[in-house]
């Protein structure tokens, strides 16, 4: 049986994700972000609810990306996720993209020219952000063009880079429905951005989100729930440069900006520059919120849930892979578990996110 990996956030899970799962082949293993997202924000709903939605709509196994994989720039996000999926035996990686191109060719380009491509990055001006530098790199070495508004396409290039030398087949699937950033409600396949924008429109949500009750009936989280915590952390921290990726310049800008900022958007707009993108600033603010220091990654793979078919696959792996199905007295990943505790502080109705939780099991096989 073909084993297909998918890297996802499902923030939240919607019809476009269901389409991706239905289109992908074989047994589907999802490497999913935890309670904080790659672009630097809290998950709309917690990781367990998102896992359940995925498992009820085509996924066979959902594993958690550790905090220091989830909340990273595209290259590190892709590398960490693919490393985990390879341990779980995937043969191919399926992903949605705005531009279906020959990603397999890009893997070969990077395999042959990785040293030259990396060296080229170091020659570019420091005034450029890292995403801008990598886009120029791909344009020069592979002739790839960018519109600047295609985040899934950019992630696809990071997947190609991370897949070099791993013998993985990349399977791009054309993104259907609304564009990534679209807030338009007039689409059967509405974007996650539109869903987050219109959570109070039950008719829209019920048509856009499979198992919509799981979304509607659980706490909806955003930066608003954590901004006061963040402000406290910034104002009371003696040395912000001890936080991951915070240099002297950023520490000074953040300390100054927090005194006049009333919300996260104002703070990000004030701190961001051409060099420090808004996404990077948001990630750094997450690092400050959870007091993240030097990154370490766990050896074990945390299983969030599985179907009967997924369980059979995991049984084949458990003797040779460090699979974690319950976090008890021994920690799985200290940083992820600390981040979970802070996420839980945002709302009194969010249940325990780590200790004692066992995987969600969907025993009934899907009919499709």
UniProtKB/Swiss-Prot annotation:
<feature type="binding site">
    <location>
        <position position="175"/>
    </location>
    <ligand>
        <name>ATP</name>
    </ligand>
</feature>
<keyword id="KW-0819">tRNA processing</keyword>
<dbReference type="GO" id="GO:0005737">
    <property type="term" value="C:cytoplasm"/>
</dbReference>
<protein>
    <recommendedName>
        <fullName>tRNA(Met) cytidine acetate ligase</fullName>
        <ecNumber>6.3.4.-</ecNumber>
    </recommendedName>
</protein>
<dbReference type="InterPro" id="IPR014729">
    <property type="entry name" value="Rossmann-like_a/b/a_fold"/>
</dbReference>
<dbReference type="GO" id="GO:0000049">
    <property type="term" value="F:tRNA binding"/>
</dbReference>
<feature type="binding site">
    <location>
        <position position="152"/>
    </location>
    <ligand>
        <name>ATP</name>
    </ligand>
</feature>
<feature type="binding site">
    <location>
        <position position="96"/>
    </location>
    <ligand>
        <name>ATP</name>
    </ligand>
</feature>
<comment type="function">
    <text>Catalyzes the formation of N(4)-acetylcytidine (ac(4)C) at the wobble position of elongator tRNA(Met), using acetate and ATP as substrates. First activates an acetate ion to form acetyladenylate (Ac-AMP) and then transfers the acetyl group to tRNA to form ac(4)C34.</text>
</comment>
<keyword id="KW-0436">Ligase</keyword>
<feature type="binding site">
    <location>
        <begin position="7"/>
        <end position="20"/>
    </location>
    <ligand>
        <name>ATP</name>
    </ligand>
</feature>
<keyword id="KW-0694">RNA-binding</keyword>
<keyword id="KW-0067">ATP-binding</keyword>
<dbReference type="GO" id="GO:0005524">
    <property type="term" value="F:ATP binding"/>
</dbReference>
<dbReference type="GO" id="GO:0016879">
    <property type="term" value="F:ligase activity, forming carbon-nitrogen bonds"/>
</dbReference>
<dbReference type="Pfam" id="PF05636">
    <property type="entry name" value="HIGH_NTase1"/>
</dbReference>
<comment type="similarity">
    <text>Belongs to the TmcAL family.</text>
</comment>
<dbReference type="GO" id="GO:0006400">
    <property type="term" value="P:tRNA modification"/>
</dbReference>
<keyword id="KW-0547">Nucleotide-binding</keyword>
<keyword id="KW-0820">tRNA-binding</keyword>
<dbReference type="InterPro" id="IPR008513">
    <property type="entry name" value="tRNA(Met)_cyd_acetate_ligase"/>
</dbReference>
<keyword id="KW-0963">Cytoplasm</keyword>
